[in-house]
């Protein structure tokens, strides 16, 4: 169908959307008025990572097309844990940990969208405002009566855990009710009509839409995004070294740029649509590049994604430094990792060094790297698993260049012992 709403047309043309409830009516509404829409994030970490970047970009586009983004921080629901897409229960967090995580997520989101009091400015809300004071008996009577356990057992978040005979606590089973109730409260308090989430949230979102109908609220809508997978079927946002955080203090802009520069050829066009603001015509032209030229598309993807997350100045600086390192053999822009001189004098095992500097996550992955001839010291391939970094490696130089594959490099420097 032809969409009238600029926002929905944009989302569908870029490949964001998976499913939507009553899309014809939602399209009509969004083409005629400013719609208040929300996306929720539980406070399980101090930052969001690339796995949440689709949702963050949608918030940015909502604002750009004249709608009002509402960000719901689940400081209340984090105390329970969402079972969607999870194989096991999450560890319980303390109130202080949840608060610290909420503040960190807010700082990340401020880089992507504008918060304020204007009609299209983003609004930050916490669901502890209404969940912490709930009376359990009243909640069961007024809200719980509208939910069928039979239906709840059919949703993937519940069904898959039960089929695998994995524990699903009663606490987690209640998460769907609380997320549905969040939608109702956001409508009552902030006139929110649309909830957006990942495809694994479809059951919870539809339950919220249905709860609104049973409580005779204005029609509510739900929209889910496609699951963010690479062409090889892996979830986005993780590397061998850990999560790709959107907080520059937890994952450096240099590494962020490199993450997108190193995506597979098959993913470049899709990621340009999802994670940059280049026009579709520009993206189509970049998709025409083949062979070695596709690296130019990857550099543009990396620089544009870094610009949105970390700012124009940092993105250009990182891109220029990368050009020096990888195309001009200039090591000046490499990150530095310090090792104690005493350890090097004794002989620092290469397996240990690779883990210390987080180039590899485990000794087994470090061994695989060496076995595949992917580890280099000063551009010389390391062939010996038992190789030890020594002072001889620092002869006539202030640093040792450590390389893992063609695209990961850093400078190892000596730190004086105190």
From Swiss-Prot:
Pfam families in the cross-refs: tRNA-synt_1b (PF00579)
Keywords linked to the UniProt accession: Aminoacyl-tRNA synthetase, ATP-binding, Cytoplasm, Ligase, Nucleotide-binding, Protein biosynthesis, RNA-binding
One GO CC annotation: cytosol
Motif ('HIGH' region): 43-52
EC identifiers of the protein: 6.1.1.1
Binding residue positions for L-tyrosine: 38, 175, 179
GO biological process, one term: tyrosyl-tRNA aminoacylation
Motif ('KMSKS' region) on chain: 235-239
A molecular function GO annotation: tyrosine-tRNA ligase activity
Binding residue positions for ATP: 238
InterPro entries, alphabetized: aa-tRNA-synth_Ic, Rossmann-like_a/b/a_fold, S4_RNA-bd_sf, Tyr-tRNA-ligase, Tyr-tRNA-ligase_bac-type, Tyr-tRNA-ligase_bac_1
Catalytic activity entry: tRNA(Tyr) + L-tyrosine + ATP = L-tyrosyl-tRNA(Tyr) + AMP + diphosphate + H(+)
Signal sequence range: none
UniProt domain S4 RNA-binding: residue ranges: 348-413
Top-level taxon of origin: Bacteria
Subcellular localization(s) per the UniProt record: Cytoplasm
Assembly with partners or alone: Homodimer.
Family label: Belongs to the class-I aminoacyl-tRNA synthetase family. TyrS type 1 subfamily.
Primary role: Catalyzes the attachment of tyrosine to tRNA(Tyr) in a two-step reaction: tyrosine is first activated by ATP to form Tyr-AMP and then transferred to the acceptor end of tRNA(Tyr).
Protein name listed in UniProt: Tyrosine--tRNA ligase
Organism: Ehrlichia chaffeensis (strain ATCC CRL-10679 / Arkansas)
């Amino acid at each position: 169908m032809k969409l009238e709403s600029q926002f929905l047309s944009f989302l569908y043309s870029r490949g964001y959307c998976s499913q939507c409830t009553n899309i014809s009516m939602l399209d009509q509404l969004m083409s005629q008025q400013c719609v208040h829409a929300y996306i929720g994030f539980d406070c399980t970490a101090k930052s969001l990572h690339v796995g949440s970047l689709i949702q963050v970009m949608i918030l940015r586009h909502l604002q750009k097309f004249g709608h009002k983004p509402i960000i719901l921080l689940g400081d209340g629901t984090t105390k329970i844990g969402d079972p969607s897409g999870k194989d096991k229960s999450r560890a319980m967090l303390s109130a202080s940990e949840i608060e610290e995580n909420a503040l960190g997520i807010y700082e990340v989101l401020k880089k992507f969208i504008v918060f304020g009091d204007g009609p299209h400015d983003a609004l930050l809300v916490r669901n502890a405002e209404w969940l912490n004071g709930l009376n359990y008996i009243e909640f069961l009577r007024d809200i719980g009566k509208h939910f069928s356990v039979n239906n709840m057992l059919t949703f993937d978040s519940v069904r898959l855990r039960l089929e695998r005979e994995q524990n699903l606590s009663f606490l987690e089973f209640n998460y769907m009710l609380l997320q549905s109730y969040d939608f109702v409260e956001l409508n009552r308090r902030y006139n929110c009509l649309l909830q957006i989430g990942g495809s694994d949230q479809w059951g919870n979102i539809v339950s919220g839409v249905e709860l609104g109908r049973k409580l005779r609220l204005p029609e509510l809508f739900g929209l889910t995004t496609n699951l963010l997978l690479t062409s090889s079927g892996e979830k986005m946002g993780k590397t061998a070294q850990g999560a790709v955080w959107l907080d520059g203090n937890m994952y450096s802009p240099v590494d962020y740029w490199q993450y997108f520069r190193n995506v597979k050829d098959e993913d470049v066009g899709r990621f340009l649509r999802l994670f940059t603001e280049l026009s579709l015509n520009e993206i189509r032209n970049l998709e025409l590049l083949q062979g070695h030229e596709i690296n130019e598309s990857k550099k543009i993807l990396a620089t544009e994604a870094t610009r949105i997350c970390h700012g124009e100045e940092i993105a250009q600086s990182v891109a220029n430094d990368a050009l020096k390192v990888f195309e001009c053999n200039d090591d000046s822009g490499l990150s530095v990792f310090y090792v104690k001189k005493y350890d090097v004098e004794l002989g620092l095992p290469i397996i240990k060094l690779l883990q210390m500097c987080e180039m590899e996550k485990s000794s087994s992955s470090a061994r695989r790297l060496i076995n595949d001839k992917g580890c280099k010291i000063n551009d010389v391939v390391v062939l010996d698993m038992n190789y030890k970094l020594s002072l001889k490696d620092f002869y006539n130089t202030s640093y040792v260049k450590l390389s893992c594959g063609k695209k990961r490099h850093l400078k190892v420097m000596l730190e004086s012992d105190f």
